[in-house]
Every structure is written in structure tokens, then in C-alpha cells.
């Protein structure tokens, strides 16, 4: 026994096993205590309720959901809405944040200072207030009968933005196939240019020509196949529009509000990252006669990314967690379905909260894993 | 060990754990607990005009608060020995089972699954409500059966969501739900046209309609799509305390039937003519003691808040801003559902 403790490596394993046992015992004690108490109080426990009929409907479900479906499916509907909002906000907050962050370091003092104050104001208003402001703005759009229309295909009202629904005809598969082929070809051209650069040092621009090849080819094919997408425009019938895709004002509000809110966080990270790159790098590049845009793209940003990416993971995870505020304006995400209606209808508070905790935890870990890969990609490659 | 439990409850932040962790082993009678503590913890709604709402001088007012007063008077002979604990729809049952409150007075519908599954017992009805629809007059809708395809605003954490789904399924109609927090947000959504119609308890819709600057542009449809008996709940297997809750309510109802009011209760107690009055007010027999209460319990409760009819009229009746008629809440002999079993 003592022998184990003397060997450092074995001791480490021993410590970890001991720790695991203690933690498991603790968790076992807690759950046993909980179950015993619930049984004594006559409260039914377990997750079997998930397979029962939910008996309520959810607005803005991404998959078919009806009140005869199960609570489990209601959870999935909420989960998908959470994922949708998280994805949209991450994409738009990142793009907006990068633009703002770069502008924040512009040599023009008017630009720098005005952006600085905008960031400070946005950052210091709580996210819930952002959401409520954008939601009430959305409600001030015209009512559905007087909705604002663009060529009778897109309608904007306070009940949502109605877009025409694309119907793919068989020719579309040909177009898609060609698109993928062109994408592969463009990728191949880029690799070849990179190889040329490594071997001979000759720079060959491919971005513009590749863009032209991909989009030009696809559009030609689309015309050749005889416009294989037909658009089904929404039409007003009864109380509401029928057909088409609807972006509900709740999704619209949370998307815009949180994109703006988190873009200020991203902008600050970008600024911090770029400022962390030593001034000598700029000076060395310009001494070699490299243009400002190339310096940024090839010298500064790759080094800044090493500083930006790790805290960016935090921002993305915060975005995920903050989408739960959608419940305040009636966006049907996980907190509203599982933590709201399902919890109330079944009274299974602990099970519902646990389910939410696990779901948020898993998505958070997935975000962390993806960001970890990106981080490895941008990190200093040690040779 | 207690310390570990405390840390745990902080971590999980599930109230259920907290309460039970600390007091699990002893399950004394709630009546004894309340008496020992010296005051009652009354779980009421957070803000519902006429039922539980902070009024002038920051004093809580409403039908639910009056019931707390009656209960406090019945147990202690003093109408102030209670603490108002506002609970939300989401936490109300957890608060009750974890002993944060002694009785749940907040308007809570008595349903089968709640009674069977949640470790609580139903004690008595307090208010008969229904569920209806509030809609703009200009849409020209006269019946809920014309609502096919409508967008409906529903408050979260209530039975309304299920009732609407059931109703639309029964009549094979479709609707789009928008779940928005009850209160000004919902009214705003209806006014601006985010939804065509609001659904809620009829009593709540009547008071909501009054909140618009132009109440005449809105109408509460005649349809009642659900029975909503708002009831008083206690913890399961707590018979004596449940009896106290049930019979305090019954005493207030019986008082109306016997013509006893807040004003004349003293008179009746001194010179009871009707033997039923004498038994109720403690002039004859030892009826209070059977429940472990003072013999004057009913007298004290009635002199604190009046009889059931008085409580109704004072808080939500036609003279108030709520403007509700008694309707189903009339006494049984007037064709309503309010009924007290005999005091014998």
C-alpha cells in the first residue's frame, strides 16, 4: 500500500480514483435522499412522463408538432429553437463584432471614439432590456391586414416577416451537383496556387477567379435547367397569411437584440487581440513595403486570433445561455417548453430542470469542442 | 451532515431539496406547527386585481388575502397573524410541499392530475371560474367556434394552454399559440395585433378589458371552454390541517346562508335564536375544539372579513372595478355552486 503512495505516477491514479469514489458516493447520497423524500411526500418521480401526450401546442416549431405528440418531442422542439437562435446569433454577432472591432482601431479619431461610445452603451445595457426593446419595436410594425409588402412576395407585419417558400423541382438536383463539383474544383485550384507559392514563391491570386467560377457556373446551370425553383408567395386568408416561411417577431427580436449585444463583446475581444500583437510586427511589415490590408490579413490577424479565440468560446457559450431569455417575450425555446409549460402541466420540476441542465450542458460542451479545434488550428505551430 | 445538505441545495437550487433537507425527519401536524410558530404562511398570487394585490398603504388586498385573514382569525383569534408569501404559478406546489407555505390560496384549479401526483390535497373551492376569449370587436367574431386559424395569446404556467388545445381539437380547428407573460405585455400584443385573441380565466379577462383605454372596442366572448374551480390546497396526509382549511371556508359560506354578516355577527353570537347559528358561532357545543381551534373560531373569522358574499362583493363584485357578477359563485339556493355542508 505504502509502495503505491511513494510512486508518484501511481499515487496520482490512486488520488483520482479516490476522488471519483467520493464524488459518486456524494451524488448517490443526494439522489437517494431526494427520491426517498419525494416518495414519502407522495410525489411521483422519474422520466416516464416524457412519453405522455403533451396536450399543448407550440408556436414557431421547426418540426411538425401537435398537441397529441409527447413531452419528449416538445423538448426537442424547444431544443431546436434554442439551437436555431444560438446559431443565428453566433454568426451575426461574430461578423458584426469583427467589423466593429476593426473599425474601433481605425486611424480616424472620429470613427474610433464614436464606436467606442456605441460599444460602451450597448455593452452596459442588460441583454433582457435589448430583447424587450426590439420586441416592442417589432410589435409596432403594421398589423397583419395592413402589412407592408415588397412586390407582393415578402410581407412585413407585426406578426412576422413572411417570405416566399422555395419549391425545388427535379432540375435543382443537377444544379446542386454542379455547384458541389465547382466547389471542389475551386478548392483544387487554391491548393495548387498554395503549392506554387511554397515551391517558387510566386503569388497567384485565386479568390476572385474562384468566386467567378463557382457562382458564374451555378447561375448558368440554373438558367440552363430552366429555373428549377418555384417560389410560393404567402397569401392572406382568414386571420393570417398562408404558405411561405414566417420569421416570428419573437425570433426576430431575440436575434437582432442579442446579435447587437454580443457583437459589442466580440468587438472588444477583437480590439484586445489586435492590440496584443506587438507594434514591431506592423513596423517590420511596412518596412518590407507590405500594404496595410495585407499586413492586417497575413501578419496581425493570424497572431491576434490566438488571443481572440479562447475568450470567444466564453462569448459563444454565453449566447447559448442567454437565448433562454427568449421566454420573456414568448420565444418557444427550451426554457419556455420544458422549463415552462411542460413543468407546469406535469409538476415534475426536478426532472424538467435536470433535463434542461443536461441539454444546455451538452450543447455548451459541443461549442467548447468546436472552438477547441479552431483554437488548435490558429495556435502557434511548434516545430 | 446538515452543512452538506445546505451546500447541496445551493448547488441544485431546487427549492424542494432545501425544505426537505432541513426538516425531513419530523412530520408534525401543520396546525401544531403554525400554532407553535405564532403565525401562518399564506401562499397567494403575486398581483391579480381583486384577488391578491398590494393596495393603499402597501397593504395586501383581495379575496385570497381575505381568506388568509379568516384563517388567521380562526386559528389565533387575531386577523393579523399571517404572512403573505406571493408564489408564481411555476413554484406554487413546490413551495407548498417544501413547507415554505402552510396553505396555497393562490387561484389554483383543482384538477385530477394535481391531486393524484403532486403530493398535495385539495381542501375546498374558493372561486368558480371558467376560461374564455377576449377579442377586438372589429373582427366581428361572436363565438369561439369562429376562431379557426387565429393567433392566440396565452399566459405561461397555467392550465389555459391545455384547455385551448383541447377545445380546438374538439372542434377540429387550428390556431397559432403565442405564449406571453400575463399583464401589460399580453394586452399590448392584443391591442397592436400580434394576436387576434387572448385566452385566460374569465375573471381575469373581465379585469383586463377594463385596462384598455377604450374597453368598448373589445368583447369577452360568451363561450366558456373549461371549468376552473379555483381551490385551496394543503400538503397530502395532513388531515387535521386540511379540515381547518375546508371548514373555515365552509363557515364563511354557511354564514351567508344564515344571514350572519361582519356587522351583525356579535349580535348573533350574544343572542342566537337559530340553533345552527349557535353551533356555528360557538355559543352552543364545543365545535371549535373538535378541530383543535378556539370555540369562537367561526365568529372570529366572520368578524374579521364577513361572510362569503361580503368578501366577493367587496373585492370583485359589481361595485368594484372588476365588476364581476356572482354567476356560478352564487349560493346553491340561488342557482349557484357555492354550498356548505351542514354544521352538526
Describe each model-derived feature in a short phrase:
Chain B
Residues 65-69, 73-75, 137-141, 145, ...:
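Extended ligand-binding regions for polar small-molecule ligands
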Residues 35-36, 72-77, 97-101, 138, ...:
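Sec-exported extracytoplasmic/periplasmic mature domains
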Amino acid at each position: 500500500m505504502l509502495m503505491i503512495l511513494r510512486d508518484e505516477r501511481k499515487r496520482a491514479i490512486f488520488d483520482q480514483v479516490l476522488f471519483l469514489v467520493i464524488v459518486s458516493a456524494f451524488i448517490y447520497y443526494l439522489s437517494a435522499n431526494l427520491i426517498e423524500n419525494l416518495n414519502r411526500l407522495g410525489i411521483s418521480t422519474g422520466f416516464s412522463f416524457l412519453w405522455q401526450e403533451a396536450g399543448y401546442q407550440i408556436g414557431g416549431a421547426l418540426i411538425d408538432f401537435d398537441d397529441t405528440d409527447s413531452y419528449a418531442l416538445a423538448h426537442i422542439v424547444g431544443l431546436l429553437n434554442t439551437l436555431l437562435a444560438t446559431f443565428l446569433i453566433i454568426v451575426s454577432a461574430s461578423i458584426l463584432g469583427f467589423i466593429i472591432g476593426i473599425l474601433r482601431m481605425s486611424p480616424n479619431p472620429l470613427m474610433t471614439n464614436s464606436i467606442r461610445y456605441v460599444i460602451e452603451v450597448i455593452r452596459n445595457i442588460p441583454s433582457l432590456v435589448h430583447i424587450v426593446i426590439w420586441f416592442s419595436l417589432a410589435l409596432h410594425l403594421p398589423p397583419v391586414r395592413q402589412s407592408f409588402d415588397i412586390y407582393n412576395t415578402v410581407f412585413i407585419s407585426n406578426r412576422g416577416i413572411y417570405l416566399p417558400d422555395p419549391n425545388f423541382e427535379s432540375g435543382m438536383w443537377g444544379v446542386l451537383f454542379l455547384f458541389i463539383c465547382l466547389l471542389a474544383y475551386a478548392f483544387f485550384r487554391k491548393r495548387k496556387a498554395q503549392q506554387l507559392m511554397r515551391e517558387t514563391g510566386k503569388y497567384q491570386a485565386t479568390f476572385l477567379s474562384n468566386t467567378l467560377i463557382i457562382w458564374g457556373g451555378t447561375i448558368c446551370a440554373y438558367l440552363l435547367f430552366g429555373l428549377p425553383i418555384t417560389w410560393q408567395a404567402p397569401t392572406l386568408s382568414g386571420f393570417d397569411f398562408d404558405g411561405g416561411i414566417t420569421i416570428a417577431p419573437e425570433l426576430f427580436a431575440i436575434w437582432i437584440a442579442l446579435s447587437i449585444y454580443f457583437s459589442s463583446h466580440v468587438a472588444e475581444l477583437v480590439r484586445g487581440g489586435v492590440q496584443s500583437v506587438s507594434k514591431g510586427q506592423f513596423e517590420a511589415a511596412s518596412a518590407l513595403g507590405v500594404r496595410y490590408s495585407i499586413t492586417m490579413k497575413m501578419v496581425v490577424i493570424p497572431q491576434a486570433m490566438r488571443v481572440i479565440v479562447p475568450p470567444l468560446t466564453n462569448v459563444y457559450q454565453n449566447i447559448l445561455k442567454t437565448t433562454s431569455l427568449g421566454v420573456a417575450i414568448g420565444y418557444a425555446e427550451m426554457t419556455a417548453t420544458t422549463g415552462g409549460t411542460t413543468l407546469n402541466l406535469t409538476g415534475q420540476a426536478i426532472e424538467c430542470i435536470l433535463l434542461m441542465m443536461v441539454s444546455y450542458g451538452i450543447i455548451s460542451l459541443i461549442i467548447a469542442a468546436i472552438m477547441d479545434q479552431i483554437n488548435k488550428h490558429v495556435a502557434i505551430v511548434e516545430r | 451532515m446538515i452543512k452538506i445538505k445546505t451546500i447541496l441545495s445551493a448547488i441544485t437550487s431546487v427549492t424542494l431539496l432545501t425544505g426537505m433537507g432541513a426538516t425531513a425527519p419530523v412530520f408534525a401536524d401543520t396546525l401544531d406547527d403554525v400554532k407553535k410558530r405564532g403565525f401562518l404562511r399564506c401562499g397567494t398570487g403575486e398581483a391579480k386585481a381583486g384577488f391578491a394585490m398590494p393596495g393603499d398603504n402597501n397593504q395586501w388586498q383581495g379575496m385570497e388575502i381575505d381568506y388568509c385573514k379568516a384563517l388567521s382569525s380562526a386559528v389565533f383569534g387575531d386577523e393579523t397573524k399571517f404572512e403573505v408569501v406571493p408564489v408564481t404559478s411555476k413554484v406554487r406546489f413546490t413551495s407548498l410541499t417544501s413547507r415554505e407555505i402552510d396553505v396555497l390560496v393562490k387561484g389554483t384549479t383543482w384538477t385530477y392530475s394535481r391531486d393524484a401526483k403532486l403530493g398535495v390535497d385539495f381542501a375546498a373551492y374558493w372561486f368558480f371560474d371558467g376560461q374564455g376569449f377576449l377579442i377586438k370587436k372589429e373582427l366581428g367574431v361572436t363565438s369561439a367556434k369562429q376562431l379557426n386559424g387565429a393567433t392566440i395569446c396565452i399566459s405561461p404556467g397555467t392550465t389555459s394552454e391545455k384547455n385551448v388545445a383541447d377545445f380546438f381539437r374538439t372542434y377540429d380547428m387550428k390556431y397559432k399559440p403565442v405564449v406571453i407573460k400575463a399583464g401589460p405585455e399580453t394586452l399590448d400584443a392584443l391591442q397592436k395585433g400580434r394576436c387576434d385573441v387572448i385566452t385566460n380565466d374569465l375573471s381575469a379577462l373581465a379585469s383586463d378589458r377594463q385596462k384598455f383605454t377604450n374597453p368598448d372596442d373589445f368583447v369577452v366572448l360568451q363561450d366558456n371552454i373549461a371549468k376552473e374551480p379555483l381551490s385551496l390546497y394543503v400538503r397530502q396526509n395532513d388531515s387535521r390541517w386540511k379540515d381547518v382549511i375546508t371548514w373555515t371556508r365552509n363557515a364563511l359560506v354557511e354564514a351567508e346562508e344564515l344571514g350572519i354578516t361582519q356587522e351583525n355577527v356579535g349580535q348573533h353570537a350574544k343572542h342566537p335564536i337559530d340553533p345552527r347559528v349557535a353551533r356555528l358561532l360557538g355559543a352552543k357545543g364545543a365545535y371549535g375544539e373538535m378541530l383543535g381551534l378556539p370555540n369562537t373560531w367561526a365568529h372570529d373569522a366572520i368578524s374579521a372579513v364577513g361572510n362569503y358574499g361580503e368578501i366577493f362583493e367587496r373585492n370583485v363584485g359589481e361595485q368594484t372595478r372588476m365588476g364581476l357578477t356572482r354567476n356560478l359563485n352564487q349560493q346553491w339556493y340561488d342557482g349557484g355552486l357555492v354550498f356548505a355542508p351542514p354544521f352538526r
